[in-house]
Regions:
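Compact, glycine-rich, soluble single-domain proteins
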Residues: 1-121
Length: 121
């Protein structure tokens, strides 16, 4: 699976360095199902996606919703299993991160993210 590094250009910080890209129907369908946790610096970028659910998941995640220009449209910190994030036609992709990442990295609505190919993908 392709991997990217995610930067917050607004804050000049690195959000995560090991983010898998779910850009096919099957990869989007499977998502994080079957995993017991997300490691620090890991994540899943689901594109296209107008929102996510955590049905069948075993752990909470931070969810960052992005518009088509990779600007943060909404955040859902600590989305627990068996929940649904907000859904909007303005959301183009969704970034799933370990719980606590939004707070630790100071991620806020309106921030501009950049996705760079990881060195070893």
């Amino acid at each position: 699976m392709k991997q990217v590094t995610v930067l917050d250009k607004t804050r000049a910080t690195t959000v995560a360095t090991e983010v898998a890209v779910a850009d096919t129907f099957l990869r989007r369908l499977i998502g994080l199902l079957g995993r017991r946790r997300l490691d620090a610096e890991a994540g899943l970028w689901i594109r296209p996606s107008s929102g996510v659910h955590t049905f069948g998941m075993l752990f909470a995640i931070d969810v960052v919703a992005l518009d088509r220009h990779h600007r943060i449209y909404a955040v859902w910190p600590g989305l627990r299993p068996w929940r649904i994030s907000g859904v909007s036609w303005k959301i183009h992709s969704v970034l799933e991160l370990p719980t606590g990442t939004i707070q630790q990295k100071g991620i806020e609505i309106g921030d501009q993210l950049e996705f760079l190919p990881s060195a070893f993908t």
